[in-house]
Each structure stands twice: as C-alpha cells, then as structure tokens.
Amino acid sequence: MKEQTASRMSAALFEYTAKPPVGEIIPLGLQHVVAAIVGVVTPAILVANICELGAADKTILVQVSLVVSALATLLQLYKIGPIGSSLPVIIGISFAYVPTLLSIGGQFGIATILGAQITGGIAAFVVGLFVKQLRALFPSVVTGTVIFTIGLSLYPTAVRYMAGGAGSDSFGSWQNWLVALITFGVVVFCNYFTKGFTKLASILLGMVVGYVLALAMGMVSFDSARDANWFQLIMPLHFGIKFEISAIISMVIMFVVNAVQAIGDFSSTTLGGMDRQPTDKELSGGIMASGIVSVVSAFFGGLPTATYSQNVGIVTVNRVVNRLVFAFAALVLLVAGFIPKFAAVLTTIPQCVIGGATISVFAMITMTGIRMITSEPLTPRNTAVVGLAVALGVGVTSVQGSLGGFPVWVGTVFGSSSVVIATLVAILLNLILPRNKTEA
C-alpha cells in the first residue's frame, strides 16, 4: 500500500525527518486539523458550561485548549531530552477525562479541576518513568473496561445537550431535538455513506449543518463573538488553582489509566505508519511529555490532553509520518488559539448541536472499549472482571445518596464518577481472581 500511495506523493512524506514540498505539507496538515478541531474545543465547552463560566471566560478556555493542544503536539514531535516521543501524533484535549472533569467542575469549579490536574500530571510523569513495570496492571480487559465505562458515563451528558442543556428555558423542546437529530443524521450519513474528506470530517460537517439550521431558527447569539478581540495573549492563573483531596484522588486515577492507554495509541501509530512497535524510550518519553504538559497548562487553564485516535487512523490509512505535516497542523491550532474572535464563534454553537454531534463520539469510545475487552478470550474470569466492575461503577453512581452515610470525600471520589469505581474494581479483580491453566 505504501508503494501505491508514494506514487502520488513524494517519498519524503513517508520519512519522519525529511523535508517534503510545502504544497504537500499544507493539505495533509489541514486534514489533521479538520479531524482534531471538534475534539479540541468540545470538552472545553462542556466544562465551561458545567462550571457556569461567563462568555468571556468560556472563550478563554477554548483559546487555551487550542494553544495547549498545539504545544503538546509540538513537544511530542520535537522532543526535549527524554521528554517527548518523536512520533507522528496529534495531541488534543481528551474526552476520556470529561466525566471526571464534569463531576469535579460541577461540585467545586474550574479552579479545583486545574489543581487536581497538576497532581494528575505529576502522576502521569511517574507512570512514564516506570511504564514497563506498570503495564502488567493494565491488560486489555482492564483498560477496555475503563474505556467502556467512560463511554457509558458520557451518554447522559450527550442526551442532556441534545435536549438543550440542563437549566435551559427550552430544555426538551422539539426545536432542540430537531436540530440535534439532524446534526446526528448528517454525522451518520457522512461517516457511513461517503468516503474521503466528508467521511473524515463527518462530525465537523454535522455540526456545520446543525449550526446553520439553529442559526436559521434564531437559536444562535453572536453577542460574545461581537465583543471578543481579534488578538489576545493567554495570561497565567486566570481561573486560579485550588486543591481538594477528593478531586485529586479521582484525577490521579484517571491520569494513570490514560497514561497506560496512551501505549495503545503510540503502538497503533508506529504499527500503522512505520511497520514496527514503539520503543520503550518512545513510550516513556511520550507519557512523560503528556504529564508535563498537563502540569504546565493547568496554570493557564488548559485541560488534560491525549493522543487523538482519529488522527492515528489517518496515519494508518495514508502512512504519512513526516513530522512537518503534523507540525503544520499544530501551528494552525496555535494561531487559532491566539484569536479570541475565532474561539468566541465556537462558543456560540448551541448545546443541542454539540449533543447531536458528540453522541456518536461517545458511542465510538464505548465500542473501542468493547473491542479491547474482546481482544482477549471472554473467559468466565474476564467476564467477571468486566461485568462486576461496570455493574458497581454504573450502579453506585446511578443511585443518588447511595454513599450518603460515608464521609463527604468518599462520596465525592466514588459516588460522582462511575469511571473511578470501575477502574479500581477492574484492577483489583484482575489481580485476585484465579486464572486457569489456559489463562496463566
């Protein structure tokens, strides 16, 4: 396949450090921007809404998300000492953290999210140092269970947004559902009935159609965009930083799990684009870089990042691994991050449009978890690990007040996010349940 693709593009595109023509770098880089842009800004909008941030602060949070994603990508491409993977990846704000971010943000606010993120980033850095030793705790059955639970926990968020967003005066109206379902329909059509650019940009195109429809129905206000500046530097500690032990525990658990999960994304990149497994040095450097970025970005309001699987998929298909292509994509995101007017326009997207577009993303997260789970035989032991972890994780958090007799911090850590309970139960059961001879 590589030879066929190379016949249409210069050979330099398939070498990491080569210098292909600018005319080839730009369209391939923009392809990665299109694939990543929705994932970069949507978590920031979700967090801004749950934290009840004003229009100006919401714009800043989106700005920072763009800048952090760009800088995190550049650090992976151009490593500093042992920090960075030197692999062709795009890094962006991660949906995997969203359930925990919404839980912490709804209870404590944005400053506590950022404080917990600092400790989580430190934990991820430590995981990077000892990645070989810690991998044994996270086989596919455990990691798959965690990802599956993340997807499940995000469905209520998507449905609330499809209905118009909690607290909205028009919550549940037919107008919200009409826009949401049309957005959803366009995403599905583009993803499964088209090829090339429209398939790649299915979520973006769905949001564009939904946005235009919402605009025609008078559901969009440009007040925040009208007042936004054309250029603005990002100032540190704008949102402040607070430390809350229960939030820290939840975030550290999520950072450790996602640090180990990053191994899969790095492996997919090297296998799909370079026909090899990643080295231990690449894995360690990549995870440590993610940890450092999370710590530093927290001081500016940036949210946790991860490797984008959709961009890994592009690498697997076209096998273009030249870092200048990815650096160009990062620079586009970086420039966009310093233009508040652009970020402000993104914040005007109605919640029903976001819900209609993201429910398919959350479904894909869930199915990724199922694929990981089924990559190992579904023995009675493995089904017990998955079933019991999901049952306790989803069950406890679905019953309000189920931990009401415990100290407040217990309810905050274990009663607000199904992912935390599912993660701990899956790890514990995987360690203590006996294996038969075929599983040993």
Label every model-predicted segment.
Residues 23-36, 172-184, 202, 217, ...:
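Hydrophobic, membrane-embedded alpha-helices of multi-pass small-molecule transporters
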Residues 44-48, 98-106, 132, 156-163, ...:
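Generic transmembrane alpha-helix signature in multi-pass membrane proteins
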Residues 104-223, 330, 335-440:
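Membrane-embedded alpha-helical modules
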Residues 60-61, 82-95, 136-145, 199-205, ...:
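Short, non-helical or kinked segments that cap or interrupt transmembrane helices
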Residues 2-10, 40-44, 48, 183-193, ...:
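Juxtamembrane interface elements at the cytosolic ends of transmembrane helices
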Residues 1-89, 96-104:
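N-terminal signal-anchor module of multipass membrane proteins
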Residues 22, 48-84, 252-323:
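Membrane-embedded helical hairpins/re-entrant loop segments and their flanking transmembrane helices
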Residues 1-28, 222-235, 271-278, 286, ...:
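Intrinsically disordered, low-complexity non-transmembrane regions of multi-pass membrane transporters
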